Regions:
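A domain-level signal for the structural core that forms small-molecule/cofactor-binding pockets
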Residues: 1-185
Length: 185
């Protein structure tokens, strides 16, 4: 990734939009924007290989309200919200913080919420070889509020279901009720 090229491209974009890039408020904007985009596009691995082996745990494990943000690949604008993940283990469990790291890893680059939701569920299901996974993401998209529909405050909800959650209505219901239950804040 070439930060200097990104900075020059931002400078060119602002100039094409007739913005005074020499003004006090805009002088460092190309550098700041370039740093933001380079940071957003720098991959982070979630390291799901480090697990705890157990035969005793086979009930729902859940982490909710994981803060998330990404950049929409359609408009290059941010979206942000919360991810909720549940899984039923099969011989291995993750440290709970790894679920947050997985979300952050899947949010890197320019992507849409639907892809992030699918990627979180797929990676956890395949790499942990668990019995089932559910991922729900609720997010506010600035592309919806700043352009087009100007739907300020609207949010989008996406879900991905893998394994036993597909057929286990009670387990799905438990997960969804736990999302809405609230908890320590």
């Amino acid at each position: 990734m070439n930060k200097e090229r990104v900075e020059n491209a931002v400078r060119e974009l602002l100039t094409a939009l007739d913005q005074d890039i020499t003004s006090e408020g805009m002088r460092d904007t190309p550098r700041r924007v370039a740093e933001m985009y380079v940071s957003q596009c720098t991959e982070e691995d979630a390291e799901l290989e480090r697990t705890f082996v157990t035969d005793k745990l086979n009930d729902l494990i859940m982490v909710r309200d994981i803060p998330m943000h990404s950049m929409c690949s359609h408009h290059l604008l941010p979206y942000y919200g919360r991810a909720h993940i549940a899984y039923i283990p099969h011989k291995r469990v993750l440290g709970l913080s790894k679920l947050a790291r997985l979300v952050y890893s899947c949010c890197k680059g320019f992507t849409i919420q639907e892809e992030v939701t699918k990627d979180v569920a797929d990676r956890l299901y395949e790499e942990l070889e668990c019995k089932g996974v559910m991922c729900v993401i609720e997010a506010v998209h600035t592309c919806m509020s700043l352009r087009g529909a100007k739907a300020i405050g609207a949010s989008a909800t996406t879900s991905a279901v893998r394994g036993v959650f597909r057929d286990a209505v009670a387990a799905r219901g438990e997960f969804l009720s736990l999302i809405n239950k609230g908890g320590p804040r």
